């Protein structure tokens, strides 16, 4: 369009002004037209890209519009959309984050219905990532959402981390892919908060946010620490964990599907609280609050 304006000037107006102005002035006018037009277009693009935050008026009232708008410019990745990750992803979306990546290759199983946000009696066998995609976009239609319907593997993780997320929530509940992800995230120096075990426990008031090296009374965290040490990683990963004594009788051996050889019993609310705490770490850190 800018060049069309210039052509109009050249074909119709310039002949009449040929005797009055020189070539230098002609090109100066060309440049002025293009510069002004591009400036207007850039301004319109910025206006169009700015997320509508009117639905976040209660959040703005709490943290202020400036910090809220800063959240709309952030990219948060949630890996694992089970009992912890599904709730964490929803809380992140409801905070006004502008861009998200969600990753999970699993489908809904009937046993998920006691604790997982996507799981209903009507959607057994459906991709958790697909269900969460529809839900998050229904919460915020302007959300830039990248959906990865895959289980964690090194190549995929490297690719996703290359997109420079501002924060990552690790809600993977199987040890091998969890260690794969944490190792690569640690090496890439991306900010991570990782969920430890929500199984075999009942008390949501016991949850803490600490460095991985400070965890105790959590069999899952113990295994994570042990496997990370094999990669020379002993500290430097922020985690959500519960020091509540685990109910060991709730342990169940499994068939090893999806890298899980065992599982603990779970209660409906506790994984959601883990997800809420993880989401709170991300949001508070991104707006400059002390964790």
Q: What does each model-found stretch correspond to?
A:
Residues 1, 9-13, 17, 23-25, ...:
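Short hydrophobic targeting helices and cationic amphipathic motifs
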Residues 44, 49-76, 110:
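N-terminal charged helix/coil linker that caps or initiates catalytic domains
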Residues 50, 161-167, 172-177, 187, ...:
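Glycine-rich phosphate/adenylate-binding loop
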Residues 84:
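Hydrophobic/small residue at the entry helix of a nucleotide-binding pocket
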Residues 94-99:
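Conserved S-adenosyl-L-methionine
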Residues 104-139:
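Glycine-rich phosphate-binding loop and adjoining beta1-alpha1-beta2 segment
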Residues 149-156:
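Conserved SAM/SAH-binding loop
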């Amino acid at each position: 369009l800018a060049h069309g304006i210039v052509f109009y000037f050249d074909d119709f107006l310039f002949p009449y002004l040929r005797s009055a102005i020189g070539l230098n002035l002609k090109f100066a006018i060309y440049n002025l037209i293009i510069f002004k037009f591009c400036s207007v277009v850039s301004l319109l693009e910025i206006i169009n890209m700015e997320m509508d935050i009117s639905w976040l008026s209660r959040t703005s009232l709490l943290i202020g519009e400036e910090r809220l708008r800063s959240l709309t410019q952030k990219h948060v990745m949630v890996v694992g959309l089970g009992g912890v990750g599904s709730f964490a992803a929803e809380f992140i979306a409801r905070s006004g984050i502008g861009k998200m990546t969600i990753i999970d290759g699993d489908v809904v199983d009937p046993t998920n219905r006691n604790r997982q946000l996507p799981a209903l009696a009507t959607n057994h066998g459906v991709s958790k990532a697909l269900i969460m995609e529809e839900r998050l976009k229904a919460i915020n239609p302007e959300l830039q959402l990248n959906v990865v319907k895959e289980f964690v593997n090194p190549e995929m993780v490297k690719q996703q981390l290359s997109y420079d997320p501002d924060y990552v929530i690790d809600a993977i509940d199987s040890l091998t892919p969890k260690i794969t992800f944490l190792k690569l995230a640690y090496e890439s120096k991306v900010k991570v908060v990782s969920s430890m075990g929500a199984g075999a426990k009942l008390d949501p008031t016991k949850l803490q946010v600490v460095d991985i090296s400070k965890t105790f009374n959590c069999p899952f965290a113990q295994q994570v620490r042990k496997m990370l040490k094999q990669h020379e990683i002993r500290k430097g990963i922020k985690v959500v964990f519960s020091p509540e004594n685990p109910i060991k009788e709730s342990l169940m051996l499994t068939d090893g599907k999806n890298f899980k050889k065992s599982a603990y019993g779970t209660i409906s609310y506790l994984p959601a609280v883990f997800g809420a705490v993880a989401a709170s770490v991300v949001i508070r850190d991104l707006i400059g609050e002390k964790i």
